[in-house]
């Protein structure tokens, strides 16, 4: 573990505490300073103190992170929502026209006894005090607040209801909800402050197989990209141009979320890594 600090002789309190927690929980590798963050989880312990677990999320079962509720025999349960956020905040931009680039990778296992699994997994970026919004289960993926919207609501009404001012997410959506703007098939989507994705691409889920999601943000080109793949299969790729300093606060947390609804699936995370560093525009 290496620590570097250029802007001050004193480590921020959150960084110092985070480093101690990493040692205790044996995160395989990590570095942190005021302008960069790196972590890697190759497995998850039962008492994983450097993660903030919300809702039904648990760690330690076979060394994995279970984002949604499972029974004692490992069967997925319906109507469940869970999230896991990394303990240390990320410095995503600063006033001197500097924005962070980042890479995130996680391996996941989605397994469902149903013919149609639901509802999906996301990688998300939110304000540092983010919690699960009320009624955000199922199609809202643990990220966006629920609201009673009539089927033929206007775009203005829709956006006002399904909006979160400080959320950027990549969704691995396993169940199409066309009434909230989903395409009529499972898909990868990029969400900017709304559950209605800015860009989507078809995703062929492989039930019960381990997949890999890789998310990249290039701050120079201002492009957010995601690639989701299974071994020996074609990848699903989606990208969207967004200026994060116009969307997110200066300090954020990164996390993973998942939900189930009437239909269900396991939302198991086997590993997770993240690297960010501030770069000039």
Curated annotation (Swiss-Prot):
InterPro entries: ConA-like_dom_sf (IPR013320), L-lectin (IPR016363), Lectin_LegA_CS (IPR000985), Lectin_legB_Mn/Ca_BS (IPR019825), Legume_lectin_dom (IPR001220), Leguminous_Lectin (IPR050258). Pfam families: Lectin_legB. A carbohydrate binds at residues 139, 175, 262-263. The mature chain consists of residues 164-281 followed by residues 30-148. Concanavalin A-like lectins of the Diocleinae subtribe undergo proteolytic processing referred to as circular permutation. The propeptide is split into an N-terminal and a C-terminal part, the gamma and beta chain, respectively. These are then religated in beta-gamma order to form the mature alpha chain. The beta and gamma chains can often be detected in cell extracts. CDD domains: lectin_legume_LecRK_Arcelin_ConA. Residues 149-163 form a propeptide. The record marks 148-149, 163-164 as: Cleavage. Gene3D superfamilies: 2.60.120.200. Mn(2+) binds at residues 171, 173, 182, 187. It comes from the Eukaryota. Keywords: Calcium, Lectin, Manganese, Mannose-binding, Metal-binding, Signal. Ca(2+) binds at residues 119, 173, 175, 177, 182. GO terms for molecular function: carbohydrate binding; D-mannose binding; metal ion binding. D-mannose-specific lectin. Binds one manganese (or another transition metal) ion and one calcium ion. The metal ions are essential for the saccharide-binding and cell-agglutinating activities. Equilibrium between homodimer and homotetramer. Belongs to the leguminous lectin family. This is Lectin CaBo.
């Amino acid at each position: 573990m290496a620590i570097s600090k250029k802007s001050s002789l004193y480590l921020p309190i959150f960084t110092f505490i985070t480093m101690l927690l990493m040692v205790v929980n044996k995160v395989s590798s990590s570095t942190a300073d005021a302008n960069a963050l790196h972590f890697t989880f190759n497995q998850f312990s039962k008492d994983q103190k450097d993660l903030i677990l919300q809702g039904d999320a648990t760690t330690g079962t076979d060394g994995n992170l279970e984002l949604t509720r499972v029974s004692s025999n490992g069967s997925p349960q319906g109507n469940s929502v869970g999230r896991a956020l990394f303990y240390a905040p990320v410095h995503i931009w600063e006033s001197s026209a500097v924005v962070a680039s980042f890479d995130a990778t996680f391996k996941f296992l989605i397994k469902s006894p149903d013919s149609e699994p639901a509802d999906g997994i996301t990688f998300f970026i939110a304000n540092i005090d983010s919690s699960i919004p009320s009624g955000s289960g199922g199609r809202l993926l643990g990220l966006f607040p629920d609201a009673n919207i009539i089927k033929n609501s206007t775009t203005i009404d829709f956006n006002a209801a399904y909006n979160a001012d400080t959320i950027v997410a990549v969704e691995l959506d396993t169940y199409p909800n066309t009434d909230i703007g989903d395409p009529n098939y499972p898909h990868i989507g990029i969400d900017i402050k709304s559950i209605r994705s800015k860009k989507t691409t078809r995703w062929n889920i492989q039930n019960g197989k381990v997949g890999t999601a890789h998310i990249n943000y290039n701050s120079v080109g201002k492009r957010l990209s995601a690639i989701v793949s299974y071994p020996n299969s074609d990848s699903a790729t989606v990208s969207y141009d967004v200026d994060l300093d116009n969307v997110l606060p200066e300090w954020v947390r990164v996390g993973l979320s998942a939900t189930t609804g009437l239909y269900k699936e396991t939302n198991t995370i086997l590993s997770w890594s993240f690297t960010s560093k501030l770069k000039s525009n």
